[in-house]
From Swiss-Prot:
This is Acetylxylan esterase A. Acetylxylan esterase involved in the hydrolysis of xylan, a major structural heterogeneous polysaccharide found in plant biomass representing the second most abundant polysaccharide in the biosphere, after cellulose. Degrades acetylated xylans by cleaving acetyl side groups from the hetero-xylan backbone. GO terms for molecular function: acetylxylan esterase activity. It is an enzyme of class 3 (hydrolase). Keywords: Carbohydrate metabolism, Cellulose degradation, Glycoprotein, Hydrolase, Polysaccharide degradation, Secreted, Serine esterase, Signal. PANTHER family: FERULOYL ESTERASE B (PTHR43037:SF3), UNNAMED PRODUCT-RELATED (PTHR43037). Gene3D superfamilies: alpha/beta hydrolase. Its main location: secreted. GO terms for biological process: cellulose catabolic process; xylan catabolic process. Optimum pH is 7.5. Residues 1-19 form the signal peptide.
Amino acid sequence: MVKLQYLLSILLYAYSCTALMLDRRDPTPGQLSQVTDFGDNPTNVGFYIYVPQNLASNPAIIVAIHYCTGTAQAYYSGTPYAQYAETYGFIVIYPESPYSGTCWDVSSQSTLTHNGGGNSNSIANMVDWTINQYNADASRVYVTGTSSGAMMTNVMAATYPNLFAAGIAYAGVPAGCFYSEANVEDQWNSTCAQGQSISTPEHWAQIAQAMYSGYEGSRPKMQIYHGSADATLYPQNYYETCKQWAGVFGYNYDSPQEVQNDTPVAGWAKTIWGENLQGILADGVGHNIQIQGEEDLKWFGFTS
């Protein structure tokens, strides 16, 4: 009887070790994989990662953030970043919202504060884990997203400017525009969404800079896309977002360096304020603005 109990204890120990190893198995190259143990995850954000089979030494990282109703899988399947990863050897992080409806929390004080314990904090910890796990190049970390993911892109650029070299926001709003005075997570803000939150570049810049109080280091260069016929996040949000980053970088919002018509698509207009800020307004395009993958690669420095 004692011998049987001893054998059972060995088997149970072996089973528990195997289960632990399976739970912590490394991501499979060439497949979207979930990471469940990456350190502090205060808001239970899902962490999915694509590690290419053709992984570069000291790889770059792109954080690709999905829209409302989206998932990591949907953004992986519907965007070109994983395909590009096989060519350029970078890693793609696909966070997944923990909320019903899968919008991102861009409203609470915690997510709008550096190391505040919100969604932004969880995503930043994914970046740190990936840098350490794969010896990634910390100077080549980029962030992009669509709709709610674009809102979070602007928030990440404001709360963790030390982490990112560049950002691209497709159809978002300025960082802090959805702020909830009641400190409610994942709260919709109709005033902002409908383009009624209008302010100066200086004020928008103050809002972004307050998210990492005292920070004086470099900030990610930003590229802002929006459709002129967006009826979900009204196009005024394009202008307000460009105001925000113009204010952050010290550009004169009213005097851009250059406007390029029919760029990168016929009917679209690219406004350049300086090397750190570009805005692209897509004439007649609604909320479902198409990702410009080749242009993204240029902005992130993979191509010229």
